[in-house]
Each structure stands twice: as C-alpha cells, then as structure tokens.
Amino acid sequence: LLTDWYLNREFTNSELRILIDGLLFSKHIPYRQCRERVEKLEGLSSQHFRARVRHIAALPQNRPDNRQLFYTIDMLDEAMEKGRQVSFHYCHAGMDHQLRPQMNEQRNPKEYVVNPYQLVAANGRYYLIANTEPHSNVSHYRVDRISDICLLETPVKDPRQVQGLEQGLDLSQHMAEHPYLFAGESVRATFRAKKHLLNDLEDWFGPAANYFHETESALDVTVKVNQEAMFYWALQYAPFVEVLE
C-alpha cells in the first residue's frame, strides 16, 4: 500500500473547460473529430469533472465534413516551417450541403498554388493568410475548405514582394484592417456610431480605432480597414452606424 502519493493533473478543471468550450464553439472542426478531441480532453480530467460537462452531448451536428482538416493544418505548418509553397483545391458548399472543389474552365478541379504565411483564428474559423500565384496581392483562405493539399519544392515568395505586406506581416494590424478576412486594399474610413457600440468597436478594432467628436449619444471613429469588410461591418450595425467617408 502506497501512501503520501497524490495525482497532480496537468490542467485544472477551469482550464479544461476553456479548452473544451473552444472546441465546441469552433465552427471549422467536423462533428466526429470535435467529439474525439473533446473525449481526449475529458480523459485528462476526473470523473467528477466529466459529470459536470453534460452539455457536450448537445454538440450540434450541422458542422462541415472536411475530414482532411487536421492533415491540412499539419501540411501548412510544415510548409511555413520549411518556407515552401503548397498546392490545393478550394471547396464551396453545394445545395446538398456537401463541399466540392471549385472547377476550372475545363471542368476539372482548379489547382491553387499558394505561398503560405500565417494561420489565424477569426470569427470561430481558421484562415490562411497567403499569396496566390501568379498574383501579387494578399489572399485569405478558409482552412476547412482546403482539400487535397500538397507540399511543393518551390520556395515561398518573400512576403515583402506581396502588395500590402511590403513591411512584413504585422499580424495585429492585419487582423484589425481585415475583420472579415476579405482580400484587397485597406482604406481609411470614418463613420459615426452610437456610443452604446463602444464595446463592440473595441472588440472589432481595438487600439486601431481613433475616436473623436464625442457627443452625448454618438462618436466619430476613424479606422484603417479593408474596404469590402467595412461595407459588411457597417451593414451588420446599420441602424447604429453612418459611414461618413
């Protein structure tokens, strides 16, 4: 009989709950793979903890079914570590809810050759920040829509040769300027917002937002942001936002 022994777990219950909730709220992980990883995390906990997370059984099944997701992430990590290009097919959903690759003019799956620079999580999904050959601008790809990825021998293009990345990739600035991960140029936008949106403004733009002309009910805001993203952001808050320029 052993005495004076105790189990020191790697994660506290609250840390495990945060990790599990992160999986539950991630929209890009297929249902089966999500459940498998939740069960792995549960295995790191006590029976007492597992009894307290019954909400896991309510995991919705209306998730994407790209079972290549984790392989894709591994390949992108390897490509970025080795500084090499990748090729892949990029999928779109059909009316039957299935993902199918985009086709070229010959009705064959279109092959994208891409210079991968960074993986980011935004709006509950994984995105790849990249450059698509032979173009010179920044591209954003939903990782859960990438299929049939291959690691190429070609060295990755220097990001300083990519329009918008001439000074390198400043990730915090890039994310502030591209809240919806649209590609394209960033512009300086000024809009008037109701003051009750201040928390939302901080969530979306953070320190990149410049506030001025404050009144009792509204304030003016200037941000540098992707033009198309600004259009959709303003639509989302249409009753409370007026774009000035």
Where do the protein language model's features map onto the residues?
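Polybasic (Lys/Arg-rich)
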Residues: 169-245
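A structural signal for short hydrophobic beta-strand segments in well-ordered beta-sheet cores
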Residues: 119, 149, 211-212
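Loop-centered beta-sheet repeat module
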Residues: 77-139
